[in-house]
């Protein structure tokens, strides 16, 4: 299932259940959704748009923000890959992952929650904040405990 906003439109949807879900914003639009169940979740915000996904259950999640937009996730996933390029924010501290990787290029921020393992990479002034007590693979800068 693919849900996308291009430009300035807004989408709201609840109670989504599918195998693979691809949700994207390109531009200044907004997407709000609750109660999502899927195997593979792809989330992308490019531009200044905002995405809020509540009560998500997924096996694998890949979420990216490019530009000044914001993605907010809550719920749980087995494995997550997060990336921010630019000044955007990826807020997933209420999205519990067993294993996660987080990469920031620019001045953006990622907030995440990992229980078993967290790999962090930063370049620029961006940072990664985390909850949980995972094994860490991280550089000397840009990581802090929430």
What do these predicted ranges mean?
Residues 1-146:
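Extended, compositionally simple hydrophobic/Ser/Thr-rich segments
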